Swiss-Prot record:
PANTHER family: BIOTIN SYNTHASE (PTHR22976), BIOTIN SYNTHASE, MITOCHONDRIAL (PTHR22976:SF2). Pathway: Cofactor biosynthesis; biotin biosynthesis; biotin from 7,8-diaminononanoate: step 2/2. The gene is bioB. This is Biotin synthase. Its cofactor is [4Fe-4S] cluster; [2Fe-2S] cluster.
């Protein structure tokens, strides 16, 4: 079957939502053929470069939200809890990031949103990091923020703000009830209004439909997220979705390919759950994605850095530093 999707996309002819759902669900369209189309687009915009990102879990487990995927949810009785870490620990993480060719360092806090004191703590730390590592991009992920807090983060040197949509608007209330889909969209838009690069992505494998998956990709196109992390559910015992099966590696590849075709110019990152869902097919994901998280995630482990570097080298790709 001749797809010709890449040429259409490169000619600025966007796929429609109905087309995308049909392509995604069509069993006659081979996953590797679809991936090759995505690779043509990825190569056009990013060549063989791979961006590296690293996470610091700066505050853990102190959260009143009931997100069904999260081991830090209010529903979880047993979880790792600690308040916002000292500035020196955050700075040490920045040093580690620089030493490991990481381009973006992500400072993440649990909870609905930060207090003004916590924002000041982060801002002071970021200002110090930028003096020593001016080339290191700083991404903050602090939850739902206020306008004045966003202005402070921008002034301190925060380059990017992550706030994932996580799922489709239709499926949102199955995932969390303590905040709305609109809350998430508004947070992303507020960061854009304050000239902070928006990072927003998804978690696939929470029981959503194929239509939901495609809706997510189009929603992210609509809000114009610069960076799109694609997480695959890593089920955690005790959470609402803890008993769900992992996605198949081939479905994961199909998802990543569709996100690339729908958001051709964006940084697309394979993120949490990639190791357990993609398994031995992880390297193939970089035919569509151009970015990965290196090291551990918030409360689940990643594979050793050396394996990620080897994967990139074996593909004939190179780190985008």
């Amino acid at each position: 079957m001749t797809l010709n999707l890449a040429q259409r996309v490169l000619n600025q002819e966007s796929l429609t939502k109905d087309e995308a759902i049909s392509i995604f669900e069509n069993a006659e369209i081979d996953t590797f053929d679809l991936l090759n189309e995505a690779y043509t687009v990825r190569k056009h915009y990013y060549g063989k470069k791979v961006k590296l990102n690293m996470i610091l879990n700066a505050k853990s487990g102190i959260c009143a939200e009931d997100c069904g995927y999260c081991g830090q949810s209010v529903k979880m009785k047993e979880k790792q809890r600690y308040a916002l870490v000292e500035q020196d620990q955050i700075k040490e993480g920045a040093q580690v990031a620089t030493e490991n060719q990481i381009g973006t360092y992500c400072i993440v806090m649990s909870g609905r949103g930060p207090s003004n004191r916590e924002v000041d703590h982060i801002c002071e730390t970021v200002e110090d990091i930028k003096k020593i590592h001016p080339q290191l991009k700083i991404c903050a992920c602090l939850g739902l923020t206020k306008e004045e807090q966003a202005k402070k983060l921008k002034a301190a040197g925060v380059d990017r703000y992550n706030h994932n949509l996580n799922t489709s608007e239709r499926y949102h209330d199955e995932v969390v009830t303590t905040h709305t889909y609109e809350d998430r969209v508004n947070t992303v838009e507020m960061m854009k209004d304050n000239n902070i690069s928006p990072c927003s992505g998804v978690i696939c494998g929470m029981g959503e439909s194929n239509e939901d998956i495609i809706d997510m990709a189009f929603a992210l196109r609509a809000i114009d997220a610069d960076s799109i992390p694609i997480n695959f559910l890593h089920p955690i015992k005790g959470t609402k979705f803890g008993g769900l099966d992992l996605l198949s590696p081939m479905k994961c590849l199909r998802i990543i390919a569709m996100f690339r075709l729908i958001n051709p110019t964006k940084e697309i990152r394979i993120a949490g759950g990639r190791e357990v869902n993609l398994r031995s097919l992880q390297p193939l994901a970089l035919k569509a994605a151009n970015s990965i998280f290196v090291g551990d995630y918030l409360i689940t482990g990643g594979q050793p850095n050396e394996e990620d570097y080897r994967m990139i080298e074996d593909l004939g790709f190179e780190i985008d530093s």
